Every structure is written in structure tokens, then in C-alpha cells.
Amino acid sequence: MAFNDDNFMLKNEAAKRLYQQIKDQPIFDYHCHLDPKEIFEDKVYDNIVDLWLGGDHYKWRLMRANGISEEEITGSASKLDKFKAFARTLQRSYGNPVYHWSVMELKNVFGVCELLTEDNAEEIYHRINAYLVEHQISPRKLIADSRVRFIGTTDHPLDDLAWHKRLTADDTFETVVAPTFRPDEAFIEHQRFADFVARLAQATGRTITDFKSFIAAMEERIAYFAENGCKASDISFTEIVFEAAEPEQLDRLMTRVLEGYQPQPLEIKQWQTAVFAELCRLYKHYGFVTQVHFGALRNNHSAIFNKLGADVGVDSLGDQAALAINMNRLLDHLVQRDSLPKMIWYNLNPSYNITVPNTLANFQANENGIAGYLQFGAGWWFADTKLGMISQMNALAEQGLLANFVGMLTDSRSFLSYQRHDYFRRILSTYLGEWIEEGEVPEDYQVLGSMAKDIAYNNAIQYFS
């Protein structure tokens, strides 16, 4: 069987027919970690390592697993040596999604059809570097060539959004680049919480002395983001919790933490519950889609974290007790307060793939006619794999309505990651095609094709409008 040809990942004739209907659709990438400054400056790349390996902790993680020295991963080794080290790793990475992503990127972006190995790495390295310069490969060119219509970046609440403003004012660039409000530091367990409160007070000109004044200052920043095109928020929680507290308790807790007190687990849960509930109230008011990523255990290798910082490939999926109880109580609390915004829930641990959409189904009711008001998000991070995508879609189809799914996102720091949308579309086509081939749904390519188009692109546009 041919590898990485036009029918790559398309396992049956029905899949091939469905894929033809969605392969050329534009991309609505509603969540990523691209830098708007890089998009605006649009510098031409001259080295594949900067574009392909720099900051890519997926690749770094594999290279460590292959015995590559840190010098050749994040250290001072030459770029050629780093490229060769990755080539040695890639040729041993069959079964890992990085292999599929990489061969798709090499072929579809740079025209490299042969497989990258240790033996041809140096020749391909120089060939791609020449291609980068000759074809003036830059962030905007990669975005345009991938037909990306919308990019949702991930942004600190105190960001002045200057680069977003410049991109909005630039008539030569058609893609919308919108900020996303990501308030990780608003939670008391964060090591920079006290500094964040001080900076928040300075940015808003407010005196923050208690929970109420803290939320008022947060609303001012949310309003600022809304004025500058923000359509979504995001947050990452280790666990989903629900622990109610009285306002006076929250005031005392905030005062103590700002004085240097280390909060206890119960207090962390109380603060997370209260702050997130207030933020959801504001997100609903300002029309933000609320994205919740949960289940990551971060920075587990302390030596690497202390040397390199966060997001360097030493994170894991986590587990937790009483997810269903906490999630149901939290969502019900939001409903009771009329504070339930449109939400996308991304679960990192696939063992909870039934729990999440099953719980969301309890709270889908809304009077605005919004289909899929609460979304079970695409397979995230370690679940961003063929099996992870299928598991997520299976769970959603069984517990809700797959046809209303808002589809794929890159959640990436790389301008080459738009190939993941094509990867997803191929897997989606095979998934739906198998239903046809096995006689589980009518062989109606108009209905199934429309469903595939909606999942690949149309649903996201409508959901974020």
C-alpha cells in the first residue's frame, strides 16, 4: 500500500469521496499559541530548525526518548546537528503522530517526498534551507498557503494587544488574528499570583483589596479584550473542582495569600470555584466562548523545568477523583447563576472521554437556538492522535451530536501545524466512511458530506460568531 499519497489515511472508497468534499475548505484555527508579533513582522525564515524544531516540545520529547543529548535538542549544538538528531529520531518514530505530521509537513510545504533519515538528513537540510529563501517562506505565506481564515492566539490578561491591533489595521493581511483571554495567574496557587494582582491594579488604575475589587478589575481587562476582537477565553486546570465559599472567606484568603501565605488544597479549590464562576458570568456577558483544558500534570522533571522553563516536554496526563460529581455541580452552579457561557471542554485523559460529553449533555438546554452550546473539544495534546481523535468522536457521537462538533484546532506554536487540520479531515473522512461501508448510516453523500463540511469548518464559524 502506498504511503503518504493522495489517499493517505483514507481507508475506504466512502472516505475518499467524503474527503474530496472537505479537503479544500479553509481553516478556522480557533485556538493556538502562535505569536502575533511574528505574524506581523513576517520575517522570512532561512533555517528549517528555527521553523520546525524550535519550541516544539513534541519533537523534543521524542528525541529524549531516543537518547539524544540535551545539547542537540535545546542546547548549543549546531542547527545541522540538531536536524540530524531529529532525523535519527524520526526514522524510529513509526506509530507516533509526530511521524505523520512531519512527513506531511515535509511533503506538502517543502515538496520533500522522500522519507527523512539519518543518511539523507544533511542533503535535505540544505535543500529546505534553500527552499525557504527562494520561496520567501514567512509566517504570513504559510498562513495564506494553508487557507487560514481565523487564528485565535493565547494571551495574558494584561497584554496591551498592540500586535493584534497592528494586524487588524493591516489591509494587506486577510486572516483575522484575534486574542484569547487566558488568566492562569488569577488563581492563588500560581507562583505569580501576587505579582499579577499588583500589575492588574496598576493596569486598571484600581485599588484591589478584596474579591469584589479583584473581579471588577478583571472585568475591565475582559472588556478591553472584547473591544479588540476577542471571541474566546481559555484556562488550564489540573483538576475540575467545586467547593463553595462565602465572600468573607475569599476576602480573607486573598489578603493572606498576598501577604505570602501558602494556600491549602481546600482553599485552592474554593478560590478556583469562585473565580471561575465569576469569570464565566463575565464571559457570557461579553460573548466569549469559554475553553477549558484540564487534566495536565506539568513540569514533572524538575531539573529540566528549572533549566529550560515550562512547555519543554516534561508534562503528563493526570487523573482525579470525583470528576463527574465536580463537573456536574460546577455546571449546575453556573446555570443557577445564569452564568453558563458557550464552552469547549478539552479532556487530556481519554479515560474520561465518556464522562465529559455525558455530563455536558445535561446542560445543553438554551433559549438561543444554539446547537452544541457546550462542546466536547477535539483530542488534546497527548490525545491529538489518530486513536485519540477517534475515541473523542466516538464518545461525542454516542453521548451527543457529532454533527454539531466544532472540529479541529492546532493548539500549536508552529506555523507548520496547519497540516494537522488535513490530518484530522482525513481521519474524519475515514471515520464517517466506515459508517457507510458497514451499513450503519445511509449511503447519502450529500448528508454525510454536509456533516463533514460542518465539522471541518462551518460549525466553528457559526459557534464563534
From Swiss-Prot:
Output the Gene3D superfamilies linked to this UniProt entry.
Metal-dependent hydrolases, uronate isomerase, domain 2, chain A
Catalysed reaction per UniProt? D-glucuronate = D-fructuronate; aldehydo-D-galacturonate = keto-D-tagaturonate
EC category name = isomerase
Q: Give start-end of the signal peptide.
A: none
Give the GO biological process terms: D-galacturonate catabolic process; D-glucuronate catabolic process
Keywords from UniProt, A to Z, are:
Isomerase
What pathway is this protein a component of?
Answer: Carbohydrate metabolism; pentose and glucuronate interconversion
Gene Ontology molecular functions: glucuronate isomerase activity
Give the EC number. 5.3.1.12
| PANTHER family per UniProt | URONATE ISOMERASE
Which protein family is named in the record?
A: Belongs to the metallo-dependent hydrolases superfamily. Uronate isomerase family.
Q: What is this protein called?
A: Uronate isomerase
Q: Which organism is it from?
A: Streptococcus equi subsp. zooepidemicus (strain MGCS10565)
